[in-house]
Amino acid sequence: GYTTKRDEYKTKMPNKKGAPHYLLYRGDISLLNRENFKKNVAVVGLLNPTADIAEREKAFVAEIIKRGGNIISGLALGCDSIAHKTCLENNGKTIAVLPSRLDNILPRENIDLANEIVVKGGLLVTEYYNEPVERFESSARYIERDRLQAYFSNSIVLVASYRHPDKYSEQYPQDGIKRDSGSRHAMKIAGDIGRKRYVLFNKSTDSLNEMFDLNKDLLSDKKNPAKILTGSELDNLMDGKLPGAIPIFE
């Protein structure tokens, strides 16, 4: 499908450049309407989570679904894939924001997952109908994908992420795996536009683990600190209140 419903975004965005002019999609576009928007939780994180991190992520995603939430992520390997798969395994609805065309799913390893998302009532969305012409443009699309994950969510959860410069191992694995894979971008934009920001963090086990360095940075952010996702905070992820900057499709 294709939509240009810019007039129906109910846009109150502080930076209107952030609003997509159109979206290409497969699946249920109503997952971006007003009522569903209140239930949309973005989940971001690194590409190479440990087994322990993966289990912690699965546990809270399952709880979000149990509470009636929808999951948004970027269809990348690692934490993104875990979020989408756990949602589907728990009979939830998930939205995948793509950095590529709908007919050129990236990464290729997730083509079957993308199809399963649509078959099970979810949604694939992208801003792109053509291929990038150069490496810089291709890299920029991953950053833009991260932006939309933030815009289409009511709240966002960072599973785990390194503190590293912005290079995309997701796209160029030869650059090294120890990157934030866009988590920093998504979390920053979420803060800028008033989304509730949460991180996984256990002081006794995660303090010296570099996989949680970005989590620690966000917790210590003096202007807009993130919160640790606890059992009680799970109920606040979907409190029925709409944030200020909302691109909604009705």
Short names for language-model regions:
Residues Y2-E250:
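Glycine-biased, small-residue-rich flexible motifs in mid-sequence functional cores and linkers
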